[in-house]
Amino acid sequence: ATQGVTLSCLTFYGEYVAMDFRGRQDNICEQILFEHCYGYPLSGEFIRIDYCYDIPRILHCHVNPANMRLFGRTFAAVVDSVIARPTYTYAIDHTDNAQLIDLFTFGAHGGIWLGPDTYGQLTNFNLDCVTVGIYKAGGGTFNRNWQIAQGSIIANVKGCGEGIHPIIISGEGHTAITNVEAFSGGNGALTAEDPQHTNDKGSDNRTFVTCDAIGAVVNGRIPAHLL
């Protein structure tokens, strides 16, 4: 088991996956802290955490292909290749009260994946040029609560799988969303698209959403734009 690790002030160049802390149920990791880390992984996966029960923290991290300018690898074809992979920049599952604060990503299929066996707080984020901004899954009605606030999502690229959506919420649990803005537009650094958002996840009235001006796909027949 990995315990008490801090990764701070790191910059990654040309990596495929930057930081992988996926444990197992019989071999967990705990007290993991990521802060002030930078990069642009070619898989689209910057931080992966699984089975980390003593409060993982991801703070002040920045993922942007501009980090690769030194090597001349910021052209649109590279970014489009990363977007085409069904991955998320930040992905967590099987955690207690995870803290995700001040996160940025650009040019990825997915921004943040919150697994079905997680809960916690996500605040102060910018997810730019993604297919899916946040995918919040829910594995039950007990203690599967996420509070999401103070963020901006630009979902405007054609990746794969779910289609273009600022937020997707599926399964059971509770999600509170406050002061999150979603919008779209072009960007010369990649191939951008801007279709209509649709709701395609089916009905489940055990998923609860509290929203304030946010476009979302919810696991129920709720309009995709909750405005």
Regions found by a protein language model. Name each.
Residues A1-L227:
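Extracellular/periplasmic carbohydrate-active domains that bind, remodel
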